[in-house]
């Protein structure tokens, strides 16, 4: 038996003298590298049909490289890391990582992170409002009996899109330029370029091509339908065009753009992910101060620990 620090290593021989190893933790304190972990499904009442996010709850001591490497390993659209807040108003601080980079804000990971913080014992200062600290500032998350909803942050970039870029977006979506009835920069962190088509049917028919853009597309369902709009989101990862199942940040910035232009009237329900086998449902509302809220159902599908 060899003891190295706080790890005990037992060298064990079976009856045939074959060597095996038994690693035992001498003290519970060794969990300095063992951290609570959960994988949350966001924006669907049906588990495994929304958009997953991996959440590491105890992240003191992790550096940027360790967070990025773990996010690369999970290979989900986002992995989040919860930390003590630096702002006294906030309940916790979160960092968002894709497999290749850190983001200043992300929508469904905000709701997943808030839910993880709650199920692992977090108690908000205000009973029904959680305050999240992230790179874009403080994000308020409301909870009721069935939904978590975040307050859409201000756009980092808005306004009209150059015609050459609109043409590039049409090529990336495999559609005619004339099919795009409007477009705008609607960046609240990930870099979204918003594209509006005439109908949900047209949105569902998109067959995306290779792109260097981060594209969000929306089209309306016929009046009286359960959903008001269909949304799809596309971005490039490693040179491959990827479709995001259900996207909170995009639905937030889409709402700010199109409600602000007087074309959409909240509240409304968005469908997303249908083409790729998901069943995302995004609840969009606006309060009396004209603050846009993005909500959905949230489910914890995996809980345990990870070692980082």
List where the protein language model places each region.
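Hydrophobic alpha-helical signal peptides and transmembrane signal-/tail-anchor segments
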Residues: 2, 6-14
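Generic short amphipathic/hydrophobic targeting helices enriched at N-termini
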Residues: 3-5, 26-29
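N-terminal amphipathic/hydrophobic targeting modules at extreme N-termini
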Residues: 7, 19-20
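Aromatic (phenylalanine/tyrosine) cluster motif
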Residues: 11-13, 21-23, 27
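Active-site proximal loop and beta-alpha junction motif in alpha/beta enzyme cores
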Residues: 27-105, 111-308
């Amino acid at each position: 038996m060899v003891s190295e620090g706080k790890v005990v290593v037992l060298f064990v021989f079976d009856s045939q003298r074959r060597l095996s190893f038994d690693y035992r933790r001498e003290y519970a304190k060794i969990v300095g590298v063992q951290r609570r972990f959960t994988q949350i499904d966001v924006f669907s009442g049906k588990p495994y049909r929304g958009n997953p996010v991996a959440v590491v709850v105890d992240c003191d001591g992790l550096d940027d490289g360790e967070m990025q490497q773990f996010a690369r390993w999970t290979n989900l659209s986002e992995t989040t890391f919860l930390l003590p807040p630096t702002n006294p108003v906030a309940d916790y601080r979160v960092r968002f990582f894709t497999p290749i980079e850190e983001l200043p804000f992300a929508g469904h990971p905000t709701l997943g992170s808030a839910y993880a913080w709650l199920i692992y014992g977090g108690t908000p200062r205000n009973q029904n409002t959680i305050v999240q600290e992230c790179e874009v500032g403080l994000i308020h998350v409301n909870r009721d009996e069935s939904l978590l909803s975040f307050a859409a942050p201000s756009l980092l970039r808005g306004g009209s899109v150059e015609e050459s870029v609109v043409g590039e977006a049409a090529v990336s979506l495999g559609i005619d330029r004339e099919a795009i009835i409007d477009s705008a920069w609607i960046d609240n962190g990930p870099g979204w370029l918003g594209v509006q088509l005439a109908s949900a049917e047209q949105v569902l028919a998109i067959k995306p091509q290779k792109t260097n853009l981060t594209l969000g597309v929306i089209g309306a369902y016929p009046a009286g339908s359960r959903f008001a709009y269909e949304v799809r989101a596309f971005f490039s990862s490693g040179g491959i065009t990827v479709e995001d199942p259900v996207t909170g940040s995009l639905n937030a910035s889409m709402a700010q753009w199109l409600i602000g232009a007087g074309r959409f009237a909240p509240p409304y329900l968005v469908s997303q992910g249908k083409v790729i086998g998901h069943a995302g449902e995004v609840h969009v509302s606006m309060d009396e101060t004209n603050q846009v809220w993005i909500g959905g159902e949230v489910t914890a599908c995996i809980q345990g620990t990870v070692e980082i």
